[in-house]
From Swiss-Prot:
This is Methyltransferase-like protein 23. Its EC number is 2.1.1.-. GO terms for biological process: methylation. It is an enzyme of class 2 (transferase). Pfam families: Methyltransf_16 (PF10294). GO terms for cellular component: cytoplasm; nucleus. Probable methyltransferase. One of its GO terms (molecular function) is protein methyltransferase activity. Keywords: Methyltransferase, S-adenosyl-L-methionine, Transferase. Belongs to the methyltransferase superfamily. METTL23 family. Residues 11-21 have a biased composition (Polar residues).
Length: 254
C-alpha cells in the first residue's frame, strides 16, 4: 500500500506548521487510494493499479503539472471556466480530474489505443471516486468529460470528439522516454491541434532522461515557440520536485 496526502489548507496553517505527506509501501496490496488535497475545498481521490502498464501510475510530471494548473487559479479563481482542455497521454488523469473540479467547460481525456480499455477503466474508477457519474459509454456529466483513444500521429483514427472540438489548452506530462521511437509523431499530433486553433496553448512537463535526444531540437524543427516556466513557486507540500522535470509552454509561431 502506498498513499500520500497533500494538504494546502490556509485555515490549518496556524495550527500545523508543516503540511503532511504520508508515504508507505506494501507489496501486499494490488491497489492503493491516494487522497490529494489540492486546496481547502478540493479533494481528489486517485486509485493506482499494480500493473506492468506504466499508464496506471502517478508520475512526478503529472503532479507538477496538476499543481501548476491549480496555481493559475490563485489570482483568478474562474481561470478555467469556459475552457476546453485536451489531455494527451493521460494515464490516471490526475490533471483532468483536477480541471473538472476547477470548472472547465469540456475536458477530453486521452491515452494510446494499445491498452486503452484498461487505462479507460482506471480513469472511470477515478472519476467515480471524485463524484463524477461516468460509464463506459462516455455519458458523463452533461457532455463535460470525455475519454477517447488517441495514439500519436494516428490521425485517421481520431474520434469525432477530437476532430470537431475547439481546444483552448492541450496538456500532457511525461510523454518522452528513452524508448520513444519517433518524437515527430508527438509533435505532429500537437501541430494538428495547433492548426485547428493557432491560439492553442500546450503545457508540457518534461523529464530529461536522455541527454543525446531532447525535445528542444524538435521544437526548432517544427518551428514552435517555447517558454520554460518556473516551477520554484509550485508548492507541493513536503514533496521534493525532481530537478530534472521541466515545465514548458508551447505555442504556434504567429
Amino acid at each position: 500500500m502506498k498513499s500520500f496526502i497533500f494538504r494546502q489548507n490556509p485555515r490549518k496553517q496556524q495550527q500545523e506548521q508543516n503540511n503532511l505527506v504520508d508515504y508507505s509501501d506494501s507489496d501486499d496490496d494490488e491497489e492503493c487510494n491516494d487522497d490529494i488535497f489540492v486546496n481547502n475545498e478540493i479533494i481528489i481521490n486517485v486509485s493506482e493499479k499494480s500493473s506492468k502498464d506504466y499508464g496506471l501510475f502517478i508520475w512526478d510530471g503529472s503532479l507538477v503539472l496538476s499543481w501548476y494548473l491549480f496555481t493559475l487559479t490563485k489570482n483568478n479563481p474562474q481561470f478555467w471556466n469556459g475552457k476546453n482542455v485536451l489531455e494527451l497521454n493521460a494515464g490516471v488523469a490526475l490533471p483532468s480530474i483536477l480541471l473538472s473540479k476547477l470548472g472547465v467547460n469540456k475536458i477530453i481525456i486521452t491515452d494510446r489505443i494499445d491498452g486503452f480499455i484498461e487505462i479507460q477503466n482506471n480513469i472511470i474508477d477515478n472519476l467515480n471516486l471524485n463524484g463524477f457519474n461516468i460509464n463506459n459509454n462516455n455519458n458523463i456529466n452533461d457532455n463535460k468529460i470525455f475519454i477517447e483513444p488517441l495514439s500519436w500521429g494516428n490521425f485517421e483514427k481520431f474520434s469525432n470528439q477530437l476532430t470537431s472540438s475547439s481546444i483552448d489548452y492541450l496538456i500532457t506530462s511525461d510523454c518522452f522516454y528513452d524508448n520513444t521511437k519517433n518524437y515527430d509523431d508527438i509533435f505532429a499530433t500537437w501541430y494538428y491541434f495547433l492548426l485547428k486553433n493557432d491560439k492553442l496553448v500546450i503545457l508540457l512537463t518534461y523529464q530529461v532522461r536522455c541527454n543525446e535526444k531532447t525535445i528542444f531540437n524538435y521544437l526548432k524543427k517544427w518551428k514552435l515557440k517555447s517558454e520554460i516556466l518556473s516551477i520554484k513557486d509550485i508548492s507541493i507540500p513536503n514533496y521534493n520536485i525532481d530537478s530534472e522535470i521541466i515545465l514548458i509552454k508551447i505555442t504556434k509561431n504567429q
